[in-house]
Amino acid sequence: MEVTAKLRGARLSAQKARLVADLVRGKPVAEALDVLAYSPKKAAKVVKKVLQSAIANAEENNGMDIDELRVSTICVDEGMTLKRIQPRAKGRADRILKRTCHITVKVAEK
């Protein structure tokens, strides 16, 4: 049985979050939490929080054993992009794209 946790609209790009997601996909949750704790990337902190939420959901709602859990699926999709303007010289303006992503983590027993 799979248990899910989702974070929608995280303020980081999906491309950067996928680099971190690939590190923990398929690993036992204890090992995945260790990998995320020592990763210097901003996305690691966000993914770790979602993974901890999925673990808590599995334990509280379904009574699963934490030691038997593994990250079965981790999916990072693009979210809404906020468009901002950066003024430049001679009356011009550049667009700044502030990207967001949706992170879905599913944990299952081995």
UniProtKB/Swiss-Prot annotation:
GO biological process annotation, one example: translation
GO cellular component terms attached to this protein's record: cytosolic large ribosomal subunit
Matches recorded under Pfam families: Ribosomal_L22
PROSITE patterns: RIBOSOMAL_L22
MF term (GO), any: structural constituent of ribosome
UniProt keyword annotations, A-Z: Ribonucleoprotein, Ribosomal protein, RNA-binding, rRNA-binding
Subunit composition and interactions: Part of the 50S ribosomal subunit.
Function statement: This protein binds specifically to 23S rRNA; its binding is stimulated by other ribosomal proteins, e.g. L4, L17, and L20. It is important during the early stages of 50S assembly. It makes multiple contacts with different domains of the 23S rRNA in the assembled 50S subunit and ribosome.
Similarity-based family: Belongs to the universal ribosomal protein uL22 family.
NCBIfam families reported in the protein's UniProt record: rplV_bact (TIGR01044)
Protein name stated in the entry: Large ribosomal subunit protein uL22
Biological source species: Chromohalobacter salexigens (strain ATCC BAA-138 / DSM 3043 / CIP 106854 / NCIMB 13768 / 1H11)
